[in-house]
Each structure stands twice: as structure tokens, then as C-alpha cells.
């Protein structure tokens, strides 16, 4: 899938964390989970839904996974530093810090607590309009 112009620099890598990947898989696997992603896919052409399911269950090579093994200690340190976030947000902030990366969120999933914690710690963030 081509990346829209201006979305990210040509050499930039995209990563996801284990919990966020699990969340996407769960949204697609369960008919009882209703969120933004499952609603969009439920209303789409079946071929689009099948392609999305394949892309989520078999994470594309272009998306690098960040191991919980690499994030458990940084997450514990964030908590010790007084960061108060839920587990998914804590993992995302730890991953961004671990990778020295920009923390990107969809505007539909804007998370004021995560954005504030990142700002306090000097981590760059970006809201992506999907």
C-alpha cells in the first residue's frame, strides 16, 4: 500500500507494539468487540475487510514489532518516574522513547493523557488525520 505523500519521511520506519497489535487483532477476531476499526471494516466491501484482516494477522514486513522484552524495564521506569498511563499508553510511550521515535496517534484516537506525558518527557508526537 503506498504511503500518502507527506505522511512520513521516505526512510522512516513504522513500528507497533505487541499490545497494540493484539488490540487490532482482537477488534477483527471478535464479533462482540465494536470499535472504530471493526465498525469501518464491517461497513466495507468484503474484499477490503479480508485484505485488512490479512494485513493485521500477518503484520507486514514494513511494520516493525517492538518486543515487550525490550519495553518491560522502560515501562517500569516510566511508572517509577511518576507517569500515570494505562498499559497500552505506557507501552506506546516506552516504545517511542526506546526507539527515539515520534509517537503517532490517529486523531480519532487522540489520547490527552498520553500526549501530555510525552510532552512532559520531551517526546515528539504527531496526530495523523485518517
What are the residue ranges of the model-derived segments?
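Amphipathic alpha-helical segments within well-ordered protein domains
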Residues: 25, 29-32, 57-60, 76
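Structural alpha-beta junctions
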Residues: 9-13, 57-63, 120-125
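Extended, non-globular alpha-helical segments
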Residues: 43-67
Amino acid at each position: 500500500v503506498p504511503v500518502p505523500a507527506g505522511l512520513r519521511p521516505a526512510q522512516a520506519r513504522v513500528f507497533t507494539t505487541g499490545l497494540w497489535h493484539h488490540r487490532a487483532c482482537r477488534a477483527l477476531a471478535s464479533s462482540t468487540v465494536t470499535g472504530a476499526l471493526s465498525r469501518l471494516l464491517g461497513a466495507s466491501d468484503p474484499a477490503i475487510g479480508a485484505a485488512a484482516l490479512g494485513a493485521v494477522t500477518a503484520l507486514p514486513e514494513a511494520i516493525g514489532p517492538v518486543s515487550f522484552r525490550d519495553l518491560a524495564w522502560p515501562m517500569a521506569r516510566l511508572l517509577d518516574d511518576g507517569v500515570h498511563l494505562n498499559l497500552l499508553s505506557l507501552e506506546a510511550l516506552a516504545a517511542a522513547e526506546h526507539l527515539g521515535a515520534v509517537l503517532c496517534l490517529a486523531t480519532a484516537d487522540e489520547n490527552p493523557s498520553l500526549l501530555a506525558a510525552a510532552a512532559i518527557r520531551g517526546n515528539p508526537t504527531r496526530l495523523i488525520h485518517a
